[in-house]
Amino acid sequence: MSSIANIRFGAPTRRNILKAAGAGAALGVLGGFAGRAFAQEKLKVAAIYTVPFEQQWVSRLHKAANTAKDRGDIDYVATENVSNTDYERVMREYAEAGNKLILGEVFGVEDAARTVAKDYPDVAFLMGSSFKPDAALPNFSTFDNYIQDASYLTGIIAGAMTRSKNIGMVGGYPIPEVNRLMNAFMAGVKEVAPDTKFQVSFIGSWFDPPKAKETAFAQIDGGADLLYAERFGVSDAAKEKSVLAIGNVIDTQADYPDTVVASALWHFEPTLDHAIAQVKAGTFKAEDYGVYSFMKEGGCSIAPLGTFEGKVPDDVKAKVAEKEKAIKDGSFTVEINDAEPKSS
């Protein structure tokens, strides 16, 4: 894994791959899905993850799938820690095994994943991706964690809680799905503390808690008294140095009751439930599922303040509630900014 291109983005031949899928694949999928409803039977769903189940991002997919399984809607199997070089093989094995919906994240194998989808037109694929779906491959839909709404609101809280007006931010890679959350958080901070300084770092990994922790230590040494924990390991550093942290995707306050002030939560259930319904109805098609992560769709929220309920100023909580209401009713829209955030 020597570069971001090899890890999160496919090779720059995506257009050629999708063009190769062509109209023939489109007809095959229409023939496979049209009129083939699965409403009266459990849907066979498989998932392929490149990281452990407990990793923040993937844990939300795994949780949503298990919730659907517990409801009796699906049969669910999953494989974790699949390398990019093995990903295509595992996709094919799950398709051959009769699974009708395959879930995963293909940021490092964009082209290969689409090739597999082309070869299995009767199988629906719902994949985390940096790219948009293409009508030439109608059985391949994409999603991402568009939780900028919740990230913005946690930024408002962070801006009120930092005393030094110096915030450290540790991310995995400077790519859209990370950048948009960081930028939304920074915008929220500036809403209440416009002069705040930001230290922004990326560790070049999706799961390296020791490296994230060391990076966070350096930011604390640089004056940060609050950390944006986009990666595991950051809150450990905050706890050891007695500074505050803002969580991302999952709520870890139970593990860090004196450290994690607030967290932006991702709820994957609306995304997955829509896909399940579409496959069962025989109407699955190429679609951008990103919108189902928006707050107004129930795709994200702020975790309860819990141990910090009495520590966050009342006027700040009121401001957050006001903005949350505006986001949900559509009168306020958080900007989606995928540009790489910079230190200030």
Q: For the regions a protein language model found, what residue spans apply to each?
A:
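A residue-level marker of the well-folded mature domains of exported/periplasmic proteins
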Residues: 40-344
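N-terminal secretory signal peptides
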Residues: 1-32, 36-38
